[in-house]
Amino acid sequence: EDGKNLKWQYQSAQGNTGTAAQIARKFVGDKSDVIVAIATPSAQAVVAATKDIPLVYSAVTDPVVAKLVPSMAPSGTTVTGVSDALELGKQIELIKRVAPAAKRVGIVYNPGEANSVVVVEQLRELLPKHGLSLVEAAAPRSVDVGSAARSLIGKADVFYTSTDNNVVSAYEALVKVGMDAKIPLVAADT
């Protein structure tokens, strides 16, 4: 009967790709009827673990670049979901309102995360059209976010954060650096 015998299993990888892979393999081994993955690394782990169990993803900026689906058109795969792609033009307008004197936008991101790379590439193209430049600092792990942000002091006039999973999971470190250095922070996601 519909609505009966539904079992939910919830696991969090806490931003760790190795843990995401373990969780995906566990759900596949449990013969789940459907797997819901939140964030690109988790969705990628599920796609790597199964081609048979349906995957519904969310919080994925570009599922094509992340290699979850071959295109945004119906693909006939077992993978579907919702993109959280940012309207970067509006984000840039907000940056200019928050920090009108700013010329250099600092971003901390994980260069190994497809979502983040897409956003950084788009910012490299868009910011100069608005009289701004991009200053980048890599944070391949959550523990790197604070030191990456500190490396931008004196180089960035404003911080911008996208939907990078490492940055979001270590957000307090970025906020602290911004507050201590009096660098405004514009966030696309918190």
Residue ranges and their predicted role:
Residues 1-190:
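Short hydrophobic alpha-helices and adjacent helix-cap/hinge residues
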